[in-house]
Amino acid sequence: MNTIIQRVEFPDNRRILMLSDIHGHAKGLEKLLKQVHFSKDDILVIVGDLVEKGPESLRTVRMVMELCRTHTVYPLMGNVDLWRLEHLFSDDPAVHQAMISYSIKARGWWKNSFLDELCQELGFIPEEAEDTQALFARLREHFAAEFDFLLHLPTVLETQRMIFVHGGIPHERLDELKETERIPLMKWDHFYEDGLSFDKYVVVGHWPTTLYSKGMPMYNPLIDHNRHIICLDGGCGVKDEGQLNLLIYPDWRSDECELHTWTDLPVITALNAQNASTDFDYIRWGDHEVELLEQGTELSRISHHGRAMTVPAEFVWERDGRTYCSDITDLRLSVQPGDRLHLITTSPLGAFVKKDGVIGWYKGRYHSNA
C-alpha cells in the first residue's frame, strides 16, 4: 500500500488534542476525553495503532469511527493496524494460522486479541475453525464497515505547523513520499535517535518514549523544540507500567501545551516522605541483557554494565542461554505524604510505582485507594 497524505488547515482558537498508540484501550481513551471535556469545538488527532495489545480493539475502532462522525477527528494508520488488515485480507491459510497462534498467546498478555474479539461477536473460537479461509471471508463480510474505515486511514497528516505520522518521515517534501510504501513511515523504530530536524513539528508515536530515556525512566511525551519533534507513545499495552499520553494545545499557533495521562494501574497514597536517590541505573528493553549474580526466590542480584542491582526475582528471565531483566530501575523517587502513586508491583524492596510518568521505588507506608 502506498503512502496516503492528508492536508488540512486547523481553524484558529480551537484546542488541538493529540495522542497515539491506544492499542485497544478504549476505556483509557474514553476516560481521557471525559477528563479534558472533549467537545465539538476541539480537534483530535490520533497518531496510529488503534488495535492489538489491549482488551478492546474492536470497541476502540468503533469508538473512533463514531467520534469521526460526531466530532473533528483525524485518525492515522499505524503499523499494527496495517499488519492486522493485511492478515485479515489474506487468503493464505498459513497467514491465518499465524494470526490464530498469535491470538492464543495474546490471551495470556492482554486477555484477548483483535481476532478473538471479531470471532467472539460471531460466536466462533478461532482455533476451532476447520476452514480458515471461510472464517476470514465471513469476518471481512461482517466487519466490512470497520475494515473499510481502517483501510482508508491516511499515513501522514500535514497542518500549518505540524506533521503527524505514526513512525516518522525522512524529510518534509511529502509529495515525494506519495508513491512510496507506507510501512517504513509507520514502523520507524528509534526515529528520534536518527538525528533528524524539521521546520514543522513532526509528531510521532510507535516507539515508547521511555526507550529514549537513557537516564530518567520517563513515560511522558518527549518534546524537542530545537529539532521540532514530538514523541507521544507512552507504552500503553506494550509495558505493564505504560500510559496513554494526551497533549493539548490551546490553539494551533501555540507553543505551550498541557499533558493528561491515563493508566490502568491501581492508585496508592503515600503516608511518608522520601528523598530521591541521585545515583541509579535504568534497565529497559533493548538494553536489558544482564549477568545473574545470585538467584533468589523473591529477590535476585544482577549486574548491568558492571553495576550490581537487586531486583524482584520475577523480573529476571532467560532466553537462548542469555539472561535478561524486564524494565526496572533502582531509582528512589521523591515522595511527599499525600502523593498519589500508581502501583506497579510490591516486593521486599518496597513498592515499585510510577509518579508523574517516572517509575521508581517508594519504601514508605501507604494507603490503598482501592
Which residues fall in each region the model found?
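Active-site neighborhood of divalent metal-dependent phosphoester bond hydrolases
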Residues: 60-154
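SH3/SH3-like (including bacterial SH3b) beta-barrel domains
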Residues: 271-286, 321-346
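Short, basic/aromatic beta-hairpin or loop at an interaction surface
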Residues: 258-271, 306-322
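Acidic, His/Gly-enriched loop-helix segments that form or flank divalent-metal centers
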Residues: 127-229, 236-240, 252, 257, ...
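SH3/SH3-like beta-barrel superfamily modules
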Residues: 285-312, 335-370
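N-terminal active-site segment of His-dependent metallophosphoesterases
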Residues: 1-63
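Divalent metal-coordination and catalytic microenvironments
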Residues: 21, 44, 49, 64, ...
